[in-house]
């Protein structure tokens, strides 16, 4: 059997002589009608999107999370269903079908696959699911692409009758492409939702020669207060732990107060995060 990219349409692979019917039955798994992947393979957000597009006969437009995946957006769970934009009565397990009207400037082509532009993708993601989820998804899309929120606002003005515009406008006010993980987004939303000033993201701290010593997840440069979300490896990896200790000493030597946030704090004791950030801001001279 020759090398075979996947997902693929079974009838096309057979017609091209890339495999035999026996190989197709025994070595591959059908994920949608006539669409196959190797039995040992696991679908990612990208390959799940491509599989859905192949199921449509290459006629649908990737939308929502599937479009975001092809725009290289991170933090999309692999198990989430693919999303296509195509007026159709057909249904397939694991595929969400939308029937939105898309203007010509709201779609683009990537590797031969038609999908919604970053702006249109953001327009759709920001209107769906809850506020926090929508902000997380927009943060990730902004971080991965050249998305400009002004372009999303233009689409909101164009499609004034679309559902979810109230949430979309709230999401646009809260989104920030500087977030590098969903937990960073959640931390920022917690701080803003508690009445603290909106923090900057990815603050660079430099020495007297302009060399970057540290990049702080978020904070308030005017008052030298930083907030950092530490993933599990910051606590379990000895080398990372040593680097963090040295880095914190460097920042404190330059007058910074750092509030460290863990998953447990964020999930179970968010009030502690807010209290520590508020205390640090007051100590730094912020007029709260």
What is the role of each PLM region?
Residues 1-166, 183, 282-288:
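Short gly/ser-rich loop at a beta-strand->alpha-helix junction or flexible surface loop bordering the NTP-binding
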Residues 7, 12, 58, 142-288:
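Surface segments flanking catalytic/ligand-binding clefts of nucleic-acid enzymes
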């Amino acid at each position: 059997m020759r090398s075979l990219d996947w997902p693929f349409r079974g009838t096309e692979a057979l017609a091209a002589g890339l495999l035999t019917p026996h190989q197709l039955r025994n070595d591959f798994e059908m994920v949608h009608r006539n669409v196959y992947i190797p039995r040992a393979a696991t679908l990612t957000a990208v390959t799940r999107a491509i599989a859905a597009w192949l199921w449509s006969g290459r006629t649908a437009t990737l939308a929502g999370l599937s479009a975001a995946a092809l725009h290289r957006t991170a933090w999309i769970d692999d198990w989430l269903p693919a999303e296509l934009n195509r007026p159709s009565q057909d249904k397939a397990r694991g595929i969400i079908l939308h029937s939105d009207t898309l203007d010509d400037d709201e779609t683009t082509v990537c590797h031969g696959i038609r999908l919604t532009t970053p702006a249109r993708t953001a327009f759709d993601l920001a209107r769906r699911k809850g506020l926090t989820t929508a902000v997380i998804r927009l943060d990730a899309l902004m971080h991965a692409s050249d998305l400009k929120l002004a372009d999303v606002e233009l689409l909101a003005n164009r499609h004034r009758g679309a559902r979810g515009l109230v949430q979309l406008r709230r999401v646009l006010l809260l989104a920030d492409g500087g977030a590098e993980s969903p937990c960073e987004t959640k931390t920022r939303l917690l701080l803003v939702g508690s009445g603290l000033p909106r923090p900057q993201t990815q603050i660079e701290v430099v020495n007297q020669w302009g060399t970057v010593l540290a990049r702080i997840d978020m904070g308030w440069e005017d008052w030298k207060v930083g907030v950092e979300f530490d993933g599990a490896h910051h606590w379990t990896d000895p080398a990372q732990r040593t680097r963090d200790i040295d880095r914190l000493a460097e920042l404190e030597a330059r007058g910074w107060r750092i509030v460290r946030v863990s998953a447990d704090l964020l999930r179970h004791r968010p009030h502690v995060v807010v209290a520590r950030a508020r205390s640090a801001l007051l100590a730094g001279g912020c007029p709260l």
